């Protein structure tokens, strides 16, 4: 079924898993546009309360009877094939559409759609670009994969031709998007439960770049060899960024303050544009900022608005998020779940004025832990001590493929101070016995490891 965002406003649309970050944003866009929306999720949440207050009919729990007088059912890749609502829709011959295709259909209703892709950094880059476009009063519609204070959550409904969204490569989802501007932040090994290897991943990003029209733009990280190759092969306009001089946009004269935030000069094709100080820490965030600046230049946003937007951007929740301080111990939470991200997070922490860094890491999915096992043994060197939790299964089942105990043994064999724990309370009790004033407690992972830090602050 095709879906016309402009014309099909008489349709009732049901979302299976409406409380998810992306699905809730899509539902909000439709509600604001006058559609009748229903949905279901396995638990209540603040996001669901917000949708209810906007007029959505939401059920807690997935049941066949929830599919009632529905014209279209939208679902995500995380929904199993035996989901009762999915089965009911099929039996009733109700049109089905997966989340990525549906998002792509909505994007077609916006002239200037921007799709931010890459293995790492999508949420932060989208957050930065959101702040910049808001500073310039472009009134964008925004879908971001995290909670952003500036827009009061994970979505913003605009009334302009500008549309900003993350574009995930998992199961080739982003190949269903029609971007006017596409960003490729980086290409790394991930989602190896779906992709065969890094070459297949890179080929998928190449296909993504070919979705951009000839008068559109591809923005890419020039220092990433695979991204650079795609920049040279695409048929649209290109704009590159990086630390090397062969990039169109570069950062020079870089300095970091005591909070790990960078100040630097932005150069375009050898010309100094302006000086900027970021409000998010880490060298990797210089690159995210440069990517967002590239898009800003494409849209002729003024330097003043770029500087204002980036200065105001404190990042999304769960992206090196300051949670609080107790007895001189700082608690920070980060979503990092890939070795490259973990390295960047710990490197950022090292730049700050802390005594010792205690890192509690919760691996995310068995397939990722197994596929990147060797890389995981090399990414925690900047932690003074690692507390390793059991693997967070997410969409997977434990088949004995790999365990946190095995990873812990490998890390200890490399000389890292590491202990394994098997519950949030065990992790909490351990760090409470070790932490002293001046230390940093860093909870890392895409699961529910954040609970440990939050409990510590309430102790």
Curated annotation (Swiss-Prot):
It comes from the Bacteria. Coiled coil: none annotated. InterPro entries: Mur-like_cat_sf, Mur_ligase_C, Mur_ligase_C_dom_sf, Mur_ligase_cen, Mur_ligase_N, MurCDEF_pg_biosynth, UDP-N-AcMur_Ala_ligase_MurC. One of its GO terms (cellular component) is cytoplasm. SUPFAM superfamilies: MurCD N-terminal domain, MurD-like peptide ligases, catalytic domain, MurD-like peptide ligases, peptide-binding domain. Pathway: Cell wall biogenesis; peptidoglycan biosynthesis. GO terms for biological process: cell division; cell wall organization; peptidoglycan biosynthetic process; regulation of cell shape. GO terms for molecular function: ATP binding; UDP-N-acetylmuramate-L-alanine ligase activity. ATP binds at residues 118-124. Pfam families: Mur_ligase, Mur_ligase_C, Mur_ligase_M. Keywords: ATP-binding, Cell cycle, Cell division, Cell shape, Cell wall biogenesis/degradation, Cytoplasm, Ligase, Nucleotide-binding, Peptidoglycan synthesis. Belongs to the MurCDEF family. Cell wall formation. This is UDP-N-acetylmuramate--L-alanine ligase. It comes from Clostridium beijerinckii (strain ATCC 51743 / NCIMB 8052).
């Amino acid at each position: 079924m095709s879906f016309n965002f402009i014309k099909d406003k008489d349709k009732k649309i049901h979302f299976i898993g409406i409380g998810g970050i992306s699905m809730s944003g899509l539902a909000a866009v439709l509600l604001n546009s006058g559609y009748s929306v229903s949905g279901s999720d396995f638990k209540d949440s603040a996001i669901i309360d917000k949708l209810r207050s906007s007029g959505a009919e939401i059920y807690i729990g997935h049941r066949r009877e929830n599919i009632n007088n529905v014209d279209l059912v939208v679902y995500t890749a995380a929904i199993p094939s035996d989901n009762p609502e999915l089965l009911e829709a099929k039996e009733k011959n109700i049109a089905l559409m997966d989340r990525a295709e549906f998002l792509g259909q909505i994007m077609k209703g916006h002239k200037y759609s921007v799709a931010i892709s890459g293995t790492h950094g999508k949420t932060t880059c989208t957050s930065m670009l959101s702040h910049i476009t808001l500073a310039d009063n472009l009134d964008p519609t925004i879908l971001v994969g995290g909670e952003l204070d500036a827009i009061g959550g994970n979505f913003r409904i605009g009334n302009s031709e500008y549309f900003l969204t993350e574009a995930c490569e998992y199961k080739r989802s982003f190949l269903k998007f029609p971007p006017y501007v596409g960003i490729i932040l980086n290409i790394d090994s991930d989602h190896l439960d779906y992709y065969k290897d890094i070459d297949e991943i890179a080929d998928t990003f190449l296909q993504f770049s070919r979705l951009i029209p000839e008068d559109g733009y591809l923005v890419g990280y020039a220092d990433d060899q695979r991204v650079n190759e795609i920049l040279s092969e695409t048929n649209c306009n290109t704009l590159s960024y990086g630390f090397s001089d062969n990039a169109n946009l570069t950062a020079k004269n870089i300095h970091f303050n005591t909070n790990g935030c960078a100040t630097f000069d932005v150069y375009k094709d050898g010309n100094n544009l302006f000086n900027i100080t970021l409000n998010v820490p880490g060298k990797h965030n210089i690159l995210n900022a440069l990517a967002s600046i590239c898009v800003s230049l494409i849209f002729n946003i003024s330097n003043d608005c770029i500087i204002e937007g980036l200065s105001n951007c404190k990042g999304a929740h769960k992206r090196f998020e300051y949670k609080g301080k107790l007895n001189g111990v700082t608690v920070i939470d980060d979503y990092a779940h890939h070795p490259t991200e973990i390295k960047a997070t710990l490197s950022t922490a090292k730049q700050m004025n802390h005594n010792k860094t205690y890192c509690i890491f919760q691996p995310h999915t068995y397939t990722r832990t197994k596929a990147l096992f060797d890389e995981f043994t090399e990414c925690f060197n900047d932690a003074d001590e690692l507390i390793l939790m059991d693997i967070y299964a997410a969409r997977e089942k434990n088949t004995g493929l790999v365990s946190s105990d095995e990873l812990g043994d490998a890390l200890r064999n490399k000389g890292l101070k590491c202990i394994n724990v098997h519950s949030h309370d065990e992790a909490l009790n351990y760090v409470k016995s070790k932490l002293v004033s001046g230390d940093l407690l860093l909870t890392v992972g895409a699961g529910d490891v954040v609970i440990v830090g939050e409990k510590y602050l309430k102790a």
